[in-house]
Amino acid sequence: MRVIWIVIGFLICINIFAEDFRIDGIRFFCRVPAKYNNHSRILVLFGGRNWPGNKTLQTYRFDAVADKHQVFLLSPSFHDRNYWEPEKWSGKTLLKAIATVERKYGLTPQKIYFYGYSAGGQCSALFYSWMPERVGAWAAHACGVYPNQPIQNAAPALITCGESDAERYQISRHFAYRYREAGGELLWKPYPETGHELSKDALKLAHAWFDAVLSEVKPVAYGEDDMLKIKPKKRIDVEYRNPLYSEKIRELWLK
């Protein structure tokens, strides 16, 4: 009986804080933070392939980070039609949804943030490349498709991937090198003995990373790829350099 009431309480909590609306036939779910003001920002959460937005919100559990920073969580229920390619149709639909939230809550347009897993990771990477001037930072887990050419001096990024997710792991690692060489700060974290699933460790790092990025803090340290060693920034070649924005991020990156 106690378990039943816990589940009911959880569902009520979700219903209180998440609303839904449709744009161009696509259902969007929006979680409103406990407090917000006209400078509140929006974090777009892209789910796995064809996930409905409410599943994404419940799986990613960014609630605490969102409330701390007064951030709106917006999740689209994209499905089919190569939706991860924003230039075809989904990009305009997302921009309409963002504008809808901004109008309803009186928000002054701010930088947008992206996070996604699997096909959602592709969305995060490709939507950023499509609208870089609007994006403050982006992150992806288990992503296998990235822009052909990284943007020069790009926004901060986080990429994580299981090492057993072999093809995506190789693609992600090499993209990380090129992104850094083009002037972007990128944190790269592989997970040994992990496949394509969205692990708890990957989500913990994503929560900590967005907490720091939304706080607009500077790195407290730098880590080197492969060796997993903390070194002075100048002693790490740029293509292997990981910015660690907080002690929590350093702890999770070294884990």
Question: What positions do the PLM features span?
Answer:
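Short beta-strand element of the alpha/beta-hydrolase
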Residues: 39-49
